[in-house]
């Protein structure tokens, strides 16, 4: 399945290369696209972004969308060469943008570290930074290999990655979030699940050795305190319940993925 997803992402961006190889004006509706452009020093091409995109205030980039909805009128006024949208945007909204003559590239949520890398390279090629993007990916894969070599042998802790609180979601197979678990030498307690929604009772029954909470603000600490209150839980007994930076963990570039993985390995062992 991962092989087909990887092929699909390359096909999508081969179209992008033909349509927008000289893109001077980009509207990014995907936070990790915005991060990628900043990493490459190409943020000057950004004319529009979402309220969740990590931009510098001094760059005065127009906010044209929140997580779900786009202000189409604002997008049109910006006259972008290309709009990069994600699977969080309603399909009918994407269709409307295309009908209005805008070039829109649809980007599904990456399902693996490999897809994150492929996507980053294609964005680099879009803005004339293909070689630099490939070099950065090479460096991060080397970091990843080094991290994996340093993992203690014979230890394969059961891991629960909690994403959000109400409802309770977890990292499942065929997602890049599960790559965090695989690459760190852990075993995913949700390995048999296809959907990410779980109950607290399910997690308690699986009895994870390590819990990573990926959410923001006071909710994260409340969730940590809740898990710690279950004194028979292995992760609670060993105090291996940790809060991770949601921005770094949920919408990573190759660099941020490896940064997050490095932190997780340090905390696990």
Predicted regions and their residues:
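Structured C-terminal subdomain patch of bacterial secreted/periplasmic proteins
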Residues: 24-25, 70, 115-128, 134, ...
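Flexible loop/hinge segments that line or gate small-molecule binding clefts
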Residues: 54, 93-122
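Basic- and aromatic-lined ligand-binding clefts that recognize polyanionic substrates
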Residues: 24-37, 131-184
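Sec/Tat signal peptide C-region and signal peptidase I cleavage site
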Residues: 16-20
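His/Asp/Glu-enriched short active-site or ligand-binding loop at hydrolase and phosphoryl-transfer sites
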Residues: 50, 174-196, 243
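A short, structured surface patch at a secondary-structure boundary
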Residues: 25-89, 105, 189-192
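Sec-dependent N-terminal signal peptides
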Residues: 4-14
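Short helices/loops that flank or line small-molecule/ion binding pockets
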Residues: 72-79, 99-100, 199-210
């Amino acid at each position: 399945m991962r092989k087909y997803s990887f092929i699909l992402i390359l096909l999508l961006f081969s179209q992008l290369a033909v349509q927008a190889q000289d893109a001077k004006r980009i509207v990014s509706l995907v936070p990790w696209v915005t991060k990628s452009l900043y990493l490459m020093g190409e943020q000057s091409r950004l004319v529009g972004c979402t309220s969740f995109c990590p931009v510098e205030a001094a760059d005065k980039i127009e906010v044209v969308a929140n997580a779900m909805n786009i202000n189409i009128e604002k997008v049109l006024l910006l006259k972008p060469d290309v709009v990069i949208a994600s699977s969080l945007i309603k399909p009918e909204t994407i269709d409307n943008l295309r009908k209005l003559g805008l070039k829109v590239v649809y980007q599904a949520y990456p399902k693996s570290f490999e897809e994150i890398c492929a996507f980053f390279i294609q964005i680099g090629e879009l803005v004339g930074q293909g070689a630099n993007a490939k070099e950065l990916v090479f460096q991060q894969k080397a970091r990843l290999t080094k991290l994996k070599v340093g993992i203690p042998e014979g230890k394969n802790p059961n891991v629960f990655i909690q994403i959000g609180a109400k409802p309770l979601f977890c990292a499942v197979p065929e997602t890049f979030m599960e790559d965090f678990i695989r690459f760190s030498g852990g075993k995913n307690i949700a390995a048999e699940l296809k959907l990410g929604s779980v109950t607290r009772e399910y997690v308690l029954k699986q009895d994870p050795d390590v819990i990573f909470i990926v959410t923001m603000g006071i909710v994260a600490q409340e969730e940590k305190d809740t898990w710690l209150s279950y004194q028979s839980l292995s992760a609670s007994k060993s105090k291996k319940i940790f809060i991770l930076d949601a921005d770094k963990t949920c919408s990573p570039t190759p660099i941020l993925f490896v940064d997050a993985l490095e932190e997780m390995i340090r905390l696990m062992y």
